[in-house]
Regions:
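Cofactor-centric catalytic regions
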Residues: 1-84, 96-203
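Short conserved active-site loop signatures built around small residues
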Residues: 91
Length: 203
């Protein structure tokens, strides 16, 4: 409704509708159209991502969305880096290889970005905190993660991300990686409106 009101005011609709007689056999009139495009369609569109902590303390982000000019490889890496509190160069992206990367229903419009990678990064942080807490011999509730270390908030003892990475890979315990998928419970409705003014020769 706000979009239609904005078009209505910008176009001077009230002064031009339904038509103005130009006095030379011609009239001027206006028309308006509105459309909606499906994006993040419920029960159809799904995005998935996997983040893995490697033994050198950097991350691999695996996605199946193809960068067709949207910049999604960079954008999704930036989102992961922001959540994980690390430099962008610490995120290595493997993209659009559906034999190796988690399922994604496609890259189009701007619906590729945001939700899944954030969820994946937050899930990986939880696993990093749990692993770090185990190394510090305390509860996960006692620790925090600052992007470089897991810190016991009560004793200020810490274990570095690099040590966690090496221990998880080489200590016969577990590889630290996390996968998430996201699909919208309802479709967000991207919409657009436009107005045209025409001059018509009635004859």
């Amino acid at each position: 409704m706000k979009l239609l009101q904005a078009v209505h005011l910008t176009a001077g609709w009230d002064e031009k509708y339904p038509a103005r007689d130009m006095g030379n056999g011609k009239i001027r009139s206006v028309g308006m159209a509105m459309a909606m495009q499906g994006s993040g369609i419920t029960c159809v569109d799904v995005g998935s991502a996997t983040l893995k902590l490697n033994d050198e303390g950097i991350y691999t982000l695996s996605i199946s969305s193809a960068d067709m000019g949207t910049g999604c490889d960079t954008i999704l890496a930036q989102i992961a880096a922001e959540v994980l509190m690390c430099p962008l160069e610490n995120i290595s992206v493997i993209a659009a290889d559906t034999d190796a990367t988690p399922y994604d229903s496609g890259s189009y419009a701007s619906s590729t970005t945001y939700v899944t990678v954030e969820k994946t990064a937050l899930g990986l942080i939880t696993k990093i905190k749990a692993f770090g807490a185990n190394m510090l011999k305390c509860s996960i509730d006692d620790v925090d993660f600052d992007g470089k270390s897991v810190i016991n908030m009560h004793t200020n003892e810490s274990v570095s991300l690099n040590d966690i990475a090496v221990s998880s890979m080489c200590g016969a315990t577990q590889s630290l990686q996390h996968t998430e998928s996201n699909s919208m419970p309802s479709s967000p409705p991207p919409f657009m409106a436009g107005m045209v003014e025409i001059e018509l020769d009635k004859e």
